[in-house]
């Protein structure tokens, strides 16, 4: 059990700056407020005060009450790393989208716990700094700058925000960033220190367009999206181009989910009267409410298609039977590695999402690189070398040395009715 005498070493990770920055936490700040209790809050207060023995006991007690809380698992692991651990950061939208944040953190927490229980990386355990950027570009840049300035941080997992605004900061600062969730195309040209574990937007839209036109036989498709979400706009534009390239037609309608007093019924009527026999709908992951109006008014009249954003438990829970047949292109599905999915579900007491598994693999990739070269530049060089190959939960992992993109293809899934309700199932 860690003693009070290690507090100065842990505090030194970000001291004195991190203690004053509530967005960066090794355990001294509560970031995920929706999955908390008074015991966890007392544990975090104890860490901030240097009473790590008390904090460890309180975190264990909190996890007995809330075993699916990854933030607590990470903070508990951090208390048990001893001296001279490797330190990485993970950046999540802790306040604006705590569900997505926890999906990412569960993957990182599982990988951290696993490697530390095995004795660490060449004898050095792994400490994880949790960072909140709320998917906001300006905050992303600010926390990225702070992480770059800290020489102890050797790699970053994130950001979830799709605009890649922080990538140039990591590139300039020589700090490896590996995105486990963002399909943004501009990550492919962001520099040598930027990597991506999921398929690019180009690959995702190409695969989905091929299914829409050639498999689902949708000749005319209409589009609903949030014009205030840059990732929505770029995904919509790329999918439109790919659909047209494959011989499909775009039905022009006014269906902007971001406008005040959005009228879903008018948009659906316009699409149907225009001859659409398919509908693509997508929204910002933090602003899904208008989507359910579209889904409700559609009443399964038009087959639905969407981006990876819709591989989300809320789509199933709030969409119900009206989302049956929804087809989405995603990086991963549990059926591709059912044994691993079952283990993760047992650990976290909830279904495993693709974000959890890609974040687990992102952490495993960093761990593998650190075994061979435990420096910022050396880690980047190893992953970029062209002969880095791993087989992890999501399958074979290697990176294009020119772009940093993972080599591989997305998976098509569709909502089907099952005895336990609507579920996403993979398409053959």
Regions found by a protein language model. Name each.
Residues 1-428:
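Extracytosolic ligand-binding ectodomains
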């Amino acid at each position: 059990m860690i003693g009070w005498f290690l507090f100065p070493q842990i505090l030194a990770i970000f001291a004195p700056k991190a203690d004053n920055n509530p967005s960066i936490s090794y355990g001294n700040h509560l970031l995920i407020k929706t999955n908390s209790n008074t015991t966890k809050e007392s544990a975090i207060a104890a860490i901030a005060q240097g009473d790590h023995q008390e904090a460890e006991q309180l975190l264990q007690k909190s996890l007995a009450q809330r075993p699916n809380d990854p933030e607590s698992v990470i903070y508990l692991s951090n208390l048990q790393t001893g001296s001279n651990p490797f330190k990485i950061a993970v950046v999540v939208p802790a306040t604006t989208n705590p569900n997505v944040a926890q999906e990412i953190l569960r993957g990182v927490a599982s990988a951290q716990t696993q490697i530390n229980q095995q004795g660490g990386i060449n004898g050095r355990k792994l400490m994880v700094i949790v960072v909140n950027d709320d998917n906001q570009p300006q905050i992303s840049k600010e926390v990225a700058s702070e992480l770059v300035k800290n020489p102890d941080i050797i790699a970053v997992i994130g950001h979830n925000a799709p605009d890649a605004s922080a990538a140039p900061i990591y590139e300039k600062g020589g700090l490896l960033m590996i995105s486990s969730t963002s399909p943004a195309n501009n990550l492919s040209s962001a520099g040598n220190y930027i990597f991506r574990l999921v398929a690019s937007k180009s690959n995702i839209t190409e695969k989905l367009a091929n299914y829409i036109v050639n498999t689902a036989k949708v000749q005319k498709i209409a589009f609903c999206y949030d014009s205030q979400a840059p990732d929505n706009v770029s995904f919509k534009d790329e999918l439109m181009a790919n659909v047209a390239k494959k011989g499909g037609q775009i039905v022009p309608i006014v269906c902007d989910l971001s406008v005040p007093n959005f009228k879903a019924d008018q948009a659906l009527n316009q699409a149907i009267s225009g001859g659409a026999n398919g509908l693509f709908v997508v929204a910002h992951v933090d602003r899904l409410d208008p989507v359910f109006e579209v889904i409700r008014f559609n009443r399964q009249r038009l087959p639905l298609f969407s981006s990876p954003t819709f591989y989300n438990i809320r789509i199933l829970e709030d969409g119900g039977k009206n989302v049956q047949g929804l087809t989405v292109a995603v990086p991963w599905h549990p059926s591709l590695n059912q044994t691993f999915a079952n283990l993760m579900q047992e650990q976290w007491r909830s279904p495993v999402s693709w974000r959890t598994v890609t974040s687990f693999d992102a952490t495993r990739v960093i761990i593998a690189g650190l075994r061979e070269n435990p420096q910022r530049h050396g880690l980047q060089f190893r992953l970029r070398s062209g002969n880095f190959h791993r087989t992890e939960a999501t399958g074979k992992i290697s990176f294009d040395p020119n772009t940093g993109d993972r080599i591989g293809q997305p998976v098509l899934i569709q909502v089907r009715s099952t005895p336990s309700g609507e579920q996403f199932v993979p398409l053959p």
